């Protein structure tokens, strides 16, 4: 060990020494070894790429082989188990057949009596375990009978159970369990033992094995065991005393039944009908039953057969429509659905059905159950024959059904409603308007929302009456009507259906047109799902009036029908009471209602009502419209509107006019032309002009305010005009403006006003010269007309007055006092003139100029009286009005000047503000 360590130490020392060549040799070796490793890695990658697909294929083949082996083993085991189960079922079936041979009308749809087996299991009719076992046995028996009858379908496909048979519907596990379908009956006090009735009293077996539609929006609802618990009375069966129908009325059905179908809801009657529906009856010693068709399926699916069983007697009687009218019995309704294919469309005549009518009337009693459910069991289905065009109505009439409990009709009614809901869901899956060729317009449904039937109407006049009843409650009603059109006469086979939106998950329901027939004397009334119409019972098309033109609707609306209280279901008795006064619905008039449809709004109006407005009403409307237009265009004040109402009476009430027929025809007024007299027109124009003046220049109250500030007792104190605003003014400018003011005032005012102003000035004057000067001025004004006076006279008068006034001021102190008084009087007269001018309605063209002249007159220069006298004399002698000197007014104090200045400023700003507003 020590030698090895020494060798390693010596080797490392020699390798690490700088003079040794071992390091160079090791580097070359390292490079070569790395290159070799890289090449090996490349070879490995290439091999993996080529080998991976083959390995994957091998793995998949291995997995597939394992799966096949597993499937083979499972299928082999399943086959064995299925064979064992089939053998057990056959044994059980043969064992159950030994209890009692079935009474069948045809190999298809046999019903076996399991009552004895049920009694052997347990005497207690309420035992759920025994009921479940009985339901399973019944399902097995039904399935076996269907499998045996599938290869060869008999033309007569109907079956019935014995006198004491219990009816049980076989259901699939996906919908409901057999336990929920078994219902027991209460024991009858009579000696015969009680019967056990399954939850579905009468339900078609084709619904059990029919494939679910492709567009079912909702799955079928499970049936609760509490919805169909009822006993049925025990009585011996009756035999139909009439033979079978002719063989050419037998329907041909293709045997295509699928067992993997979901459970359909309960039904009472399923009556298949196309253009003409044929029924095959089978006679048996103990009982008989009628074969019916199941609910409608999409056109791609094959037809289905339904089997109706009963315990007492036949529940259906086929009668023609006219013969049913002659009986006068109470009506009802049932579910009707057409088959899709394989139907013999040869229609029998009405006479072929009449030979067995007496037998039918004798074999069945007329004791109907007086309940709403029995009224719902009768339907009317009217159809046209494809050959010959004869109309034959097939009616299913329930007879002699009696129950021990009064709750049985309500339970059966719930069964009918659930079945109708399922049929409605199946119809909602289809696209609107996609009717198959065999699906005629005579399609009807019986559901919780509509207990109505359909009838082929040969014209397109239909008054609709939609109903929306959820869970047997009528929520709202509305009258709807379709207007007649002439196009329906050309092709009466095409029916226009009213679309009804149900709010279900699908887009909307199929175009439904169900009706219910109400017999009233010789006439009949068809209550549509979406309408009500009165038609005659003759086979000929009724004569319809031509389309009426559309007019304006009446102002009086038609009262809507009253809403029924909640919990009250719509039945045939309520439909019959539509024509009676005491019914909750309004009585329909004998004449058809004409309809105006504007944007989805329906207006109902009787035929005899006025279809257009009267000329007087049109004039009233025009008058009101023109009045509104005038008010909007002119914007007249309330005074003008009041005067207009005095001369133009308002339009009378159209309702009163219609009653009295005495119409006051108003005058048609063109906008801008008022029917006023000349005097009223002048007054109106003057009033409007005054209002315009007031709006433009201010209201008269402003002038009153200015006059109140310039009263004679305090005018001198308020005549303080500051020179800071306009500066000193020359006398010539003042004199010129004064002359212009006097000239304009003399030319625009009447003679009386000038006399009054001159009298005011003459009373204030003192002195002979002054009095003469004041007298000459009014004389000149009186001699000359204000409108024809010349400018020279006015100017001379004004200059003379002003000159005498100035000369008087230069005399002495008394002259100064008199001059001040004259100035005050002149200002007062001027303002009064302007005030009267505005009150008289004249255009105030001189308002601004007069105000400016007054301001200039007041703003006399306050100089010495000698200078004023000298200037006035120089102006009078040389007639040179251009004097550059100025003088302040010494007779006004500073306080008075400030007050006058503030007043002038405010008075000057008010018109400007009014104009800007």
Swiss-Prot record:
<dbReference type="InterPro" id="IPR039509">
    <property type="entry name" value="SPATA31"/>
</dbReference>
<feature type="compositionally biased region" description="Low complexity">
    <location>
        <begin position="152"/>
        <end position="163"/>
    </location>
</feature>
<dbReference type="Pfam" id="PF14650">
    <property type="entry name" value="FAM75"/>
</dbReference>
<keyword id="KW-0744">Spermatogenesis</keyword>
<keyword id="KW-0812">Transmembrane</keyword>
<dbReference type="Pfam" id="PF15371">
    <property type="entry name" value="DUF4599"/>
</dbReference>
<feature type="region of interest" description="Disordered">
    <location>
        <begin position="773"/>
        <end position="797"/>
    </location>
</feature>
<keyword id="KW-0472">Membrane</keyword>
<feature type="compositionally biased region" description="Polar residues">
    <location>
        <begin position="164"/>
        <end position="177"/>
    </location>
</feature>
<dbReference type="InterPro" id="IPR027970">
    <property type="entry name" value="SPATA31F3-like"/>
</dbReference>
<feature type="region of interest" description="Disordered">
    <location>
        <begin position="55"/>
        <end position="80"/>
    </location>
</feature>
<protein>
    <recommendedName>
        <fullName>Spermatogenesis-associated protein 31D3</fullName>
    </recommendedName>
</protein>
<keyword id="KW-1133">Transmembrane helix</keyword>
<feature type="compositionally biased region" description="Basic and acidic residues">
    <location>
        <begin position="782"/>
        <end position="797"/>
    </location>
</feature>
<comment type="function">
    <text>May play a role in spermatogenesis.</text>
</comment>
<feature type="compositionally biased region" description="Basic residues">
    <location>
        <begin position="63"/>
        <end position="74"/>
    </location>
</feature>
<dbReference type="GO" id="GO:0030154">
    <property type="term" value="P:cell differentiation"/>
</dbReference>
<comment type="similarity">
    <text>Belongs to the SPATA31 family.</text>
</comment>
<feature type="transmembrane region" description="Helical">
    <location>
        <begin position="29"/>
        <end position="49"/>
    </location>
</feature>
<dbReference type="GO" id="GO:0007283">
    <property type="term" value="P:spermatogenesis"/>
</dbReference>
<dbReference type="GO" id="GO:0016020">
    <property type="term" value="C:membrane"/>
</dbReference>
<feature type="region of interest" description="Disordered">
    <location>
        <begin position="152"/>
        <end position="195"/>
    </location>
</feature>
<keyword id="KW-0221">Differentiation</keyword>
């Amino acid at each position: 060990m020590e030698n090895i360590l020494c060798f390693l130490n010596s080797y490392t020392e020699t390798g690490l020494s700088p003079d040794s060549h071992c390091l160079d040799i090791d580097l070359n070796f390292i490079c070569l070894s790395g290159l070799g490793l890289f090449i090996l890695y490349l070879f490995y990658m290439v091999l993996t790429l080529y080998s991976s697909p083959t390995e994957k294929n091998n793995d998949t083949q291995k997995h597939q082989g394992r799966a096949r082996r597993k499937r083979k083993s499972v299928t082999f085991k399943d086959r064995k188990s299925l064979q064992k189960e089939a053998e057990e079922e056959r044994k059980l079936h043969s064992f159950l057949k030994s209890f009692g041979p079935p009474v069948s009308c045809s190999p298809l749809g046999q019903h076996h009596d399991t009552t004895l087996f049920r009694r052997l299991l347990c005497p207690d009719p309420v035992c759920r375990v025994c009921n479940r076992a009985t339901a399973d046995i019944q399902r097995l028996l039904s399935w076996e009978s269907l499998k045996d009858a599938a290869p060869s379908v008999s033309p007569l496909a109907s079956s019935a159970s014995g006198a004491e048979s219990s009816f049980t519907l076989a259901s699939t596990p996906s919908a409901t369990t057999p336990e929920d379908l078994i219902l027991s009956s209460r024991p009858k006090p009579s000696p015969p033992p009680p019967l056990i009735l399954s939850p579905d009293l009468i339900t078609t077996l084709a619904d059990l094995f029919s494939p679910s539609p492709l567009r079912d929006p909702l799955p079928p609802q499970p049936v609760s065991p509490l919805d169909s618990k009822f006993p049925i009375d025990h009585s011996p069966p009756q035999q139909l005393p009439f033979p079978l129908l002719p063989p050419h009325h037998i329907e041909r059905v293709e045997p295509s039944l699928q067992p993997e179908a979901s459970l359909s809801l309960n039904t009472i009657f399923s009556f298949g009908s196309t253009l003409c529906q044929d029924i095959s009856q089978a006679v048996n010693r103990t009982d008989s039953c009628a074969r019916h068709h199941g609910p409608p399926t999409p056109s791609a699916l094959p037809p289905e057969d339904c089997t109706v069983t009963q315990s007492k007697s036949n529940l259906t009687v086929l009668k023609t429509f006219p013969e049913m009218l002659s009986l006068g019995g109470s009506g009802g309704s049932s579910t009707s659905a057409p088959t899709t294919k394989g139907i013999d469309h040869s229609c029998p005549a009405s006479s072929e059905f009449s030979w067995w009518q007496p037998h039918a009337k004798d074999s069945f009693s007329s004791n109907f159950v007086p309940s709403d459910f029995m009224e719902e069991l009768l339907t009317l289905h009217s159809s046209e024959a494809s050959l010959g065009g004869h109309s034959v109505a097939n009616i299913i009439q329930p007879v002699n059904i009696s129950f021990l409990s009064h709750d049985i009709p309500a339970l059966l009614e719930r069964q009918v409603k659930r079945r109708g809901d399922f049929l409605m869901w199946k119809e909602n899956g289809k696209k609107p308007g996609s009717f198959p060729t065999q699906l005629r317009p005579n399609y009807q449904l019986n559901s919780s929302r509509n207990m109505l039937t359909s009838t082929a109407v040969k014209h397109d006049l239909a008054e609709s009456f939609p109903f929306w009843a959820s869970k047997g409650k009528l929520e709202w009603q509305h009258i709807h009507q379709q207007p007649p059109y002439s196009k329906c006469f050309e092709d009466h086979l095409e029916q226009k259906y009213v679309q009804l939106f149900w709010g279900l998950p699908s887009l909307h329901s199929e175009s439904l047109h169900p009706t219910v027939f109400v017999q009233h004397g010789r006439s009949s009334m068809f209550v549509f799902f979406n309408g009500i119409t009165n038609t005659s019972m003759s086979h000929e098309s009724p004569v319809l009036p031509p389309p009426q033109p559309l007019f304006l609707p009446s102002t009086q609306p038609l009262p809507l029908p009253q809403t029924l209280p909640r919990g009250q279901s719509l039945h045939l008795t309520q439909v019959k009471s539509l024509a009676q006064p005491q019914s909750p619905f309004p009585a329909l008039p004998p004449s058809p209602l004409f309809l105006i449809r504007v944007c989805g709004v329906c207006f109902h109006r009787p035929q005899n009502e006025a279809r257009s407005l009267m000329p007087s009403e049109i004039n009233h409307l025009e008058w009101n419209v023109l009045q509104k237009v005038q008010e909007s265009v002119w914007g007249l004040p309330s005074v003008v509107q009041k005067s207009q109402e005095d001369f133009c009476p308002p339009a009378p009430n159209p309702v009163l006019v219609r009653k009295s027929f005495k119409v006051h025809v108003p005058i048609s007024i063109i906008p801008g032309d008022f029917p006023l007299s000349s005097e009223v027109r002048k007054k109106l124009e003057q009033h409007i002009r005054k209002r315009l003046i007031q709006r433009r220049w201010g209201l008269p109250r402003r002038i009153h305010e200015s006059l109140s500030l310039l009263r004679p007792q305090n005018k001198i104190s308020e005549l303080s005009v500051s020179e800071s605003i306009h500066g000193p003014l020359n006398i010539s400018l003042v004199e010129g403006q004064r002359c212009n003011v006097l000239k304009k005032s003399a030319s625009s005012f009447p003679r009386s006003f000038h006399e009054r102003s001159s009298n005011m000035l003459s009373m204030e004057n003192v002195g002979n010269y002054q009095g003469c000067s004041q007298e000459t001025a009014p004389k000149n004004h009186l001699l000359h007309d204000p409108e024809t006076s010349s400018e020279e006279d006015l100017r001379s008068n004004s200059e003379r007055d002003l000159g005498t006034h100035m000369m008087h001021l230069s005399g002495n102190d008394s002259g100064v006092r008199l001059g001040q008084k004259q100035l005050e009087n002149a200002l007062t007269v001027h303002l009064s003139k302007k005030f009267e001018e505005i009150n008289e309605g004249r255009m105030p063209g001189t308002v601004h100029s007069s105000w400016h002249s007054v301001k200039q007159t007041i703003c006399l220069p306050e100089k010495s009286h000698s200078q004023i006298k000298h200037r006035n004399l120089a102006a009078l002698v040389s007639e040179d009005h251009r004097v550059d000197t100025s003088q302040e007014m010494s007779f006004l104090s500073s306080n008075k000047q400030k007050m006058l200045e503030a007043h002038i400023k405010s008075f000057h700003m008010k018109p400007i503000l009014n104009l800007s507003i």
